[in-house]
Amino acid sequence: MKLVNLKQAILQAWKERWSDYQWAINMKKFFPKGVTWDILNLAEALLDQAMIGPAPNPLILSYLKYAINSQMVSYSTVLTAISKFDDFSRDLCIQSLLEIMDMFCDNLSCHGKAEECIGLCRALMSALNWLLRCATFYTDKLKDVLDPVAGENHLSMCLQRLKSILGSTKNRALIHIAKLEEPTSWTSVEQSQLRLSESISLLPSVQLRNQAEECVSLIRSIPSMLSVHSDQLQTNGFPTVHAVVMLEGTMNLTGDAQPLVEQMNTVKRMQRIPLHLFLLEVWKACIVGLIESPEGTEELKWTAFTFLKIPQALAKLKKLSSMEQDFNEDMKCAFEYLLKLTPLLDKADQRCNCDCVSLLLQECNKLGLLSEQNMENLMAKRTADREQAPRLKSSENSTIQPNPGLILRAEPTVTNILKTMDADHSKSPEGLLGVLGHMLSGKSLDLLLAAAAATGKLKSFARKFIQLNEFTRHIGVESSKAANVRALLFDISFLMLCHVAQTYGSEMILSEGCPGGEMPFFESWMQTCMPGEGRVLNPDHPCFRHPDIAKVEALVALLNTSTEMKLAQTKWHEVCLSIPAAILEIHNAWENGVLSSEAIQKITDNIKGKVCSLAVCAVAWLVAHVRMLGLDERDKSLQMIRQLGSPMFGDNTLQFYSERVIIMSSILDNMCSEVLQQTTTQIKFSAAGSEPMPYIHRLPPKTPIKEVLRGAFSSTLEKGWVDSRTLHNFDTLLHMGGVYWFCNNLVKELLRETRLEFALRAVELLYAIFCLDMQQLTLTLLGHVLPSLLTDSAKWHMLMDPPGRALAKLSVWCAMTSYSTQNKGQPSPRQRKRHREDIEDYSSLFPLDDTQQSKLMRLLSSNEEEHNVQANPVDRPMNSSLSASQIHNISSKEPLNRVLANLFLLISSVLGAKTAGAQTQFVQWFMEECVESLELGGKGCILQFMPFSMVSELVKVSTLSSPKIVLAITDLTLPLGRRVAAKALTAL
């Protein structure tokens, strides 16, 4: 009955000709307090009465306008009422309705509850649909109207209102929310827009047609509002891309290509780098790496990385690209830019003794990254440029085979060797020995290993040699020749596996697990007895003590009395396990004067004379023993190591002795360097062909590591890019100082930088350096370093612009990278080897149970007004800590998730604090960077950990009070997220 009474009141006012303010006073007398006019549908009732005749009733319309101005009725009910009027033939009524819309559509607001704000979004979308239908009606009417001028005026009125509504970013944002809230209604809008698009094509007026097309274009842009980002300022270089490529090529050649592809794609997206410039930077980094890599194994690894792994990674990146054909064009463009860097390419060609670019072009063509025509054109251009390039004058260059060509030929050879190794070893051990002997010649082994590492086959390669090593443990009745072959197969496989473990990491050797089976001998020996990778071995550990004392004594007697090791029926794995205990006995005898130096020389010659693996096992124990001795007690141990590492000269050695000694010397050099680097003792091995480890002993002696870190970062910043040697320095410093020390000190260096250009450069370089262990460094940065800066008022001055803005950018980049990769794949080899003792237990710092809040969460949640959490997540009250991640049931077991949740709570408290300053400005930059780095769609990004209550605080910050930012920082896939966004938008 209320509706009837309302109509009666309106009719009485019209009959008695009440003025608008008299009408308002009397209406409030007629109806009790507590009943809102929207519930009574006052706006709809007034419009119904005003639009009864062919022309609108001006008096009743004045009542409606007064109700709008005095906020008796909400904008949403007025728009809903207007959208229900569908008699477009009544021109005067339509004109009046459009004038009413003019009163408020340019500044829509709602200060009620979130549901009322959502209602305004729905009403605005309904009004948009109504305007589209109205414009379509007048467009169609123009075909038959007798007075085209009047018809065009009516259409122009509709289009002007459409443009007025759609021209406001805020209004489009509200419609965007309504689209997600009511997809069926948005479908109706799209259909109306389609009908208008079809109608306007026949419009005679160019001006009206352009006006209508502009409105249609604005409507089409609404679904993609979040995908529009500000343009990235173009720079001359992208140090992050360079450093990420350098890091991968220097320290993670064996890693799977997919994580590299995802990381490169993340960097490209976050920094808004055009694809052709991104590809150019990748190739530049590869060529610089080729030029600066140390000769030997590292050079081969870089060559394999550049010519095998990177083309394959870019082929995977192409599959991620939305338009693959454009990718090929961008690749062509990147090579065109690269060809302009003639001095760089000439230096690479001089180093590699070949045309590097032509080989890269051929590889890209094989993988479908370049067309045949483009490849030929680019090769012709480079050939012409090379005519002017300096040539090496050395006469031996014509005989040097270029490493890139060797690597490319080695790649199919790896596959063939794997097939050969699959055969039954017992049928033709001599043939297999011939294959292995060929692998040992020259640098064939390192070429094959580098090619296998770059193509992801190294682990399979190593497994084959472990199987071969295990095969030699099975002894039958054997002749002297068979015993020689078996000894050689054991020795070569053992040495190769040691070399692989030292060059590419022990994870290449380790199997996934041996359930129900015995661990292979070499795996067991490597894990317990082999020095390296930061392991400090105890020479008295049981692994160095053979349980069968009789066998040890027999071995000591054999070494001391015999002129050479016997081979037949010898169980080489048992000899390897017995050697440490035997060496201890021999060493003690020498120390006590029982054995002479000549006897020791004879014993060491026996050990290394036939099977070099025995010398490796002996030195493994000796270097562990040396660490336990004082400086004045080491002479005899070091002398034994030198004797074991020196090659023998004579004919009484087994086949491939010189090749095996070269590998043995390299293994011993590496083994001793890693273990003795802290004892200021160096042992040089003079075997022909052995090369010093290129990255050992590179930290300056007697210099505090903090100064080393500061110097390394300063020089890198001035140079603008990070080289491979410096990357190894940073990795060593991270290992020595720990994650917190490393992160905290680098952030301090960043905050000291007051030059804008250098601060932004520092961010790119630090992001790449943090890739050494992104997950752990991000946890430290977000969980320790940032909270310390934001909660300590004495440190707030450090967050001023530009260093504060730079730190915000670094934090967001690290957070987004870590969050996007935390559930993908395994950590890289260098991360698995890192010690974790210095990382605080995040499970206790941020408890798993939501009811068991951390100290920080209790502090920040102490002012909550609503404590009850309802069963339905969508119906939960908006307390200060509820976030989208909780509604999505994101796992709180992940340390990064807990750190992000607590960081956003801290940010929320900074925004809500009474004191504003640099810390507030930092939060603003942090949120701006989150929005800038947001992926299309935004679902699953770090912003889901932001409390919903924080949105209303953010819009109070002037630079964050934009509709696009509100849409970006809220999870619009959730009903609660849409309500929060609508409430924030309508308050702008």
From Swiss-Prot:
Keywords: Activator, Nucleus, Repeat, Transcription, Transcription regulation. Pfam families: Med24_N. It is found in: Nucleus. A motif (LXXLL motif 5) lies at residues 786-790. It comes from the Eukaryota. GO terms for biological process: positive regulation of transcription initiation by RNA polymerase II. GO terms for cellular component: mediator complex. GO terms for molecular function: transcription coregulator activity. A motif (LXXLL motif 3) lies at residues 445-449. A motif (LXXLL motif 1) lies at residues 128-132. A motif (LXXLL motif 6) lies at residues 856-860. A motif (LXXLL motif 2) lies at residues 341-345. InterPro entries: Mediator_Med24. Belongs to the Mediator complex subunit 24 family. Component of the Mediator complex, a coactivator involved in the regulated transcription of nearly all RNA polymerase II-dependent genes. Mediator functions as a bridge to convey information from gene-specific regulatory proteins to the basal RNA polymerase II transcription machinery. Mediator is recruited to promoters by direct interactions with regulatory proteins and serves as a scaffold for the assembly of a functional preinitiation complex with RNA polymerase II and the general transcription factors. This is Mediator of RNA polymerase II transcription subunit 24.
